[in-house]
Amino acid sequence: MVAVAAPAGAAESAPARQAAETCWATHYGPQPPGALTASGELFDNNADTAATSLTRNPQLPFGTLVRVTNVANGASLVVRINDRGTFQQTPAEPKCLDLTDGAFSRLGGVLNPDQGHIVVTQEVLG
């Protein structure tokens, strides 16, 4: 790698990107027909969307994009926050996202028999 000097007056380096947070992602499971998310959208259990944990402070705004990566297999996808969850912290890992069943499966989560959660990293993209 070759170092390149910054132009005079430029900042020495851009701030380092914050490390991705490790946490548990769960999934919704069956929802009644016509269910709405907290953002008012019709719930789609196959969409790449998620609820953010109410234990997160501050809350991620609706529409925030988050890259979620399964630590066990490296599978990754970007989900859009459109709901709020009611999760609680656990001694092992905080619960951070409640994924749709489709997103959970695409990341390698097992629905039947239900493994309950997967350990993920999450990176807020914007």
Language-model regions: role of each:
Residues 1-126:
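Secreted/periplasmic proteins
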